[in-house]
Structure formats: C-alpha cells, structure tokens
A protein has these predicted regions:
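NTP-dependent small-molecule kinase module
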Residues: 244-255, 276, 280, 326, ...
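Glycine-rich adenosine-cofactor-binding loop
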Residues: 10, 92-97, 104, 109, ...
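Adenosine-phosphate binding glycine-rich loop
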Residues: 197-258, 398
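NAD(P)-binding Rossmann-fold cofactor-contacting core
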Residues: 134-151, 289-296
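ATP-dependent small-molecule kinase phosphotransfer cores
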Residues: 290-348
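Phosphate/diphosphate ligand-binding glycine-rich loop within oxidoreductases
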Residues: 2-107, 201-203, 213-216, 220-225
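Rossmann-like adenosine-cofactor binding region
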Residues: 150-217, 337-343
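A glycine- and Lys/Arg-enriched "phosphate-lid" helix/loop adjacent to the NTP-binding pocket
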Residues: 349-387
C-alpha cells in the first residue's frame, strides 16, 4: 500500500530544513518536492496526489486557485503555505502568519505604536504586513529594488530615521548567496529590532550588522519551526502543545545544525580539541589549514615562502567563505584567520566562535610560519588578543588535559542559547 505523501513544494529546495523539522515533530515521512517550473507545479496540483503539503517560494499565490476552501486568514493575506487534502478536497491555510508572530513575540518585539520598515514585496511581505498591522504598528513602510507602487527604494528608506523595526522578507543573504545586505542598520538611529525571515544561515549579514548596533536581532529559524508545528496541526488534525514544542524543537535543531568554529593562537590545540569535539557532538570536522592545502595543492609553509602572507590570507578567506556556509561542522581555523574581519563575520553566521586560550609556554609552535617562540610569540599574542576577543562568542581555557578541554567545550556549547 502506497504511503500518504507529505512534503514541501517550491522552486528550489536545496537549502530547506523542513524535512528534518517535520520528522522531528510528527511520525510521517516528509519529502522535499522541488518543482522548478510552473508547468510542473500545475501538473502536481492538478493530480492532487498528496495527503498534505507545505508551499514555499514561488508558489504561495500560485496554489490558491487549486484550493477548494481557503482559510479566511490566508485569503486576507493572499498567500497559502499549507494545503491539506481531505477526501479529494483541498484546504488552504497560512501558518506563516502565526510563525512570524511567534518569532516576534519570542524576542520581545512589539509592533504597537512603532514605525516598521519591511524589505521586499513578495509573498511573505503580505504576511508580515498583516502581523504588524494587527499588532498595532503606527506606520508600515515598504522598500524594494524598484520602488514600484507605494514602495520606497532601498536608498530612500535609508533616509527614514524614524524607523524602529526592520523586517527582511527577501531572499537577500540566504544560502548560498550569504554576505549580501540590502541596507545598513546604522542608518536608523531609532532602531530597536531587526527580524529576518531568512533561516539559512542563522545570522544573515543584515542580522550581524544589527548585532553590531546593539539592537535585538533574530533570524527566521524559529519562524520556520513554528509554522511547521502549526502546519502539523492541520496535517494531523491534532492540537499540539505549541508553547512547549516550538522552543524545544528550535533549540534541539539549532544545536544539531550549528557550526562550532575554533580560533586561537598557533599551537593552542585548535585542531586537536576540534577533532575530539566534532566526534563528541557528531559533527563533521574541518581543519581549515588542511582544507587550504588540499585545495591549493601546496603546504602552508611553502605558500608563505613562495607567495607571501598576503596570498595565503586570500586563499584562507576564499576557502573559509565556502566552508562556513555549511552546517553541523566543527571548524578549526588558523591562528591568523581573525586578521580579516570578514572571516570573523563568516564564522558567526552559523554558530558560536570558540576562542581556545592556552599559556604561551605550552603552545606548540613547530612548523608554523608566523610563530617562532620567545619574544616574537609574545608580540604575536599581544597583537592578536584583541582580535580574538572581538571575534569570539565564548572562551575555552585549555590549561589541562584534552578530555577536560573537550568536556568543557561540550558544556559551553550545550548551554549556549545564542546560536
């Protein structure tokens, strides 16, 4: 007997976490069903050969005519992201509304009386607008690349100093095109919070800049989990303890998917601790220096000798930018990786940055181009300590045994609520 089909349809789904989220919540198998063209989406919807599906970009409006019944909330928003097949009749819902409302509430973002700037005019824009309007926002502004309709150009939006909350509803900064950003939060002196519906990476460039400004910043992962939990209620017809399930599943999966990036002085034990930590956390281990050697075909001392440090740092930045896009990794970095601020930002996008500290006299410096020991090593430590402090999110004192260091690293990671 053929199993009922549950899954997600969309144009491109390579970045999706929906399968692991749904299968964590419920007991059905959940499939990713990419439909690159409207013709394929049309055929899929006409066949109705599914029990229940979620819908993502670019089909949230496209599927509405195929629904026999559309929930009033979804009808008002003009977007459907959840469809349930009940005896051949398709029922359409929008759980993004509740998901975004959950995200805002979980981070203490209150729209009442606030001026809100929404980036983008796609399907999620209408959902976010509805939540902000229902939350009592004083003014809701929209910005887009074209400035069509009532939307401002992004450059025009930067001249609205009264903006208090920014919400990004565009795919800008989403995997694999990480590092992109439409506006600079520094331009908004009254800014209180930035929310980004992008969930991969955990922290987009927009959110990293918001954190630098000291304002509340939250990505879309909790929204993704919340809307999935609410969708599961429609899929199964069962009411769930959403108040308990959403934060628990969000926390568990963020820890499962997060990278742990390790920085510190040459010879402090980054690779040794990292390899053991990866095994304990069941994550892939990446030694960045080894990866650079693999990709360039040259060992690092030879690169320094033949091409110089500047060339090595370019290789390092390029390799790190690619590696850091992944998830569920422990990444052991070279000692000088923090000399480039862009590297530190890349490491922060998908998890904590662990600074391993070890006494100078205990550092292993053999075969390392820039750490020869003695006075030079002390000078190197003095130069880099402020950079390690700025780049790291947590500190590991590696003064004892490997087992003790790994135990402490696991404890720090599992206790980290800022992933």
């Amino acid at each position: 007997m053929q199993q009922p089909l549950y899954g997600l349809i969309g144009g491109k789904l390579g970045h999706s976490y929906s399968k692991i989220i749904h299968e964590k919540i419920a007991d059905y198998t959940y499939e990713l069903l990419p439909l690159p063209t409207e013709a394929e989406a049309r055929t899929f919807m006409e066949k109705r050969a599914f029990a229940a599906i979620n819908v993502t970009i670019p089909y949230k409006q496209f599927v509405i005519p195929y629904c026999d019944v559309v929930d009033p909330k979804a009808q008002a928003i003009g977007a459907v992201n959840t469809i349930v097949n009940r005896d051949g009749k398709l029922y359409g819902y929008n759980t993004d509304y509740a998901g975004f409302a959950y995200l805002a509430g979980a981070h203490g973002v209150d729209f009442a009386g606030k001026t809100v700037l929404i980036l983008g005019t796609g399907g999620t824009h209408s959902t976010v607008t509805a939540v902000c309007r229902d939350g009592g926002a004083k003014e809701i502004l929209t910005a887009s690349r074209t400035g069509k309709g009532d939307a401002l150009l992004y450059s025009e939006a930067m001249h609205r100093p009264d903006v208090q909350i920014i919400v990004n509803t565009t795919p800008c900064g989403m995997f694999p095109n990480v590092g992109q950003c439409l506006i600079d939060p520094k331009a908004f002196p009254a800014l209180e919070a930035v929310l980004d519906v992008v969930y991969n990476p955990f922290r987009t460039e927009l959110l990293l800049r918001a954190e630098d400004c000291g304002v509340t910043a939250a990505g879309g992962f909790e929204m993704l989990v919340a809307q999935a939990v609410f969708a599961t209620e429609h899929f199964t017809g069962r009411q769930l303890d959403t108040a308990a399930i959403i934060p628990a599943v969000s926390r568990e999966l963020r820890h499962q998917l997060a990278n742990v990036s390790i920085i510190g002085m040459p010879g402090c034990g980054k690779s040794t601790v990292g390899a053991a930590l990866a095994k304990r956390l069941d994550k892939k281990f990446v030694d960045l220096d080894a990866e650079i050697e693999r990709r360039t075909g040259h060992n690092i001392p030879d690169i320094f000798a033949q091409e110089g440090e500047a060339a090595f740092r370019r290789y390092e930045a390029d390799v790190l930018a690619e590696v850091a896009k992944g998830n569920s990794q422990v990444i052991a970095c070279g000692g000088g990786v923090i000399k480039n601020p862009a590297n530190a930002r890349a490491l922060r996008q998908n998890g904590p940055v662990l600074w391993v500290r070890r006494p100078l006299e205990a550092l292993a410096t053999g075969g390392r181009p820039l750490s020869k020991g003695g006075a030079a090593l002390k000078q190197l430590e003095a130069e880099r300590t402020p950079l390690y402090e700025a780049a790291s999110t947590v500190v590991l004192e590696n003064y004892g045994t490997l087992t003790a260091a790994v135990d402490k690293a696991v404890q720090l990671f599992e206790a980290d609520e800022r992933l």
